[in-house]
Amino acid sequence: MIYNYLYLILITNFLILTIAFSLNLKLKNAGIVDVIWPLLFISNIGIITKTNPNLSLYQLVFLFIIFLTNLRLFIYLLIRFIKHHPNEDTRYTNFKSSFPKFPNLAIFFIYQFQGIFAAILFIPLIPALLTNKNTLGTIEILGIFIYLIALIGEFYADKQLSDFKSKNNDSLCNSGLWKYSRHPNYFFEWLNWVSYFIYGLNGNNGWLCIIPSLTMLILLTKITGIKPSEELMLKKRGQIYETYIKTTSAFIPLPPKSL
């Protein structure tokens, strides 16, 4: 059964990202894929819902928290994209410059890679999502509680940064949640995936739900999240950001250190 879902999800992601690539060509802005990213998970939820018409309470809650996370992220990223368009994210500009002879083909492949990666994150959740039970125990309640912390935390981290940037283009945001973590948005994004793991523990093969949370932890802290973001900020802010690094936790919100 999992193989059937894998096939459906990969095909769906491929089609969605092919449409996203067409939008990229029309808008001349590869950053549109960031807006599309949460829609991949929403479409995957649609597949589960469509193929399981009689969903249990456990399934409905699990699907809803994943849906709400990605709906919020979609709205936030769409607003951000509209605000900055036609300026393209430097990640994609730099990526295209690495392939001067075939930049569009390179972008197409990086889009499709994101579709595969989204499937890798979602597939381990499916056995738990297919668990048919109508009760929520202590573990599920704990998962929901952690999820609410993650949802609220990510919302405020994004809002605080957005509000700060609108008033202080040339300064460093180190107030609010950003006083306690250099990347609170990434931390709470990861906490979403932790909540899926906790909620799914008592589901079918619930231990598999740890795979996406560990994958996102590595991705955000070592590959596409903190690392490139801090390299850019060090170039832009120099000594100010070096001081921020010395006094403020990189990921987990902690009391600031004194120099």
Q: What annotation goes with each model-predicted range?
A:
Residues K26-L27, F99, R237, T248:
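A broad structural signal for alpha-helix termini and local helix breaks/kinks
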Residues N70-L125:
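Hydrophobic alpha-helical segments and helix pairs
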Residues S22-L23, F95, M233, Y244:
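Broad structural signal for hydrophobic residues in well-ordered alpha-helices, predominantly aliphatic
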Residues Y5-L17, L40-F74, I79, A118-L259:
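Hydrophobic transmembrane alpha-helices
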Residues K26-L27, L71, Q112, S181:
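Transmembrane helix irregularities
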Residues M1-N4, S22-A30, I48-N54:
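Short, hydrophobic transmembrane alpha-helix segments
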Residues L27-S43, P86-F109, S171-W178:
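Juxtamembrane helix-capping/reentrant segments at transmembrane boundaries
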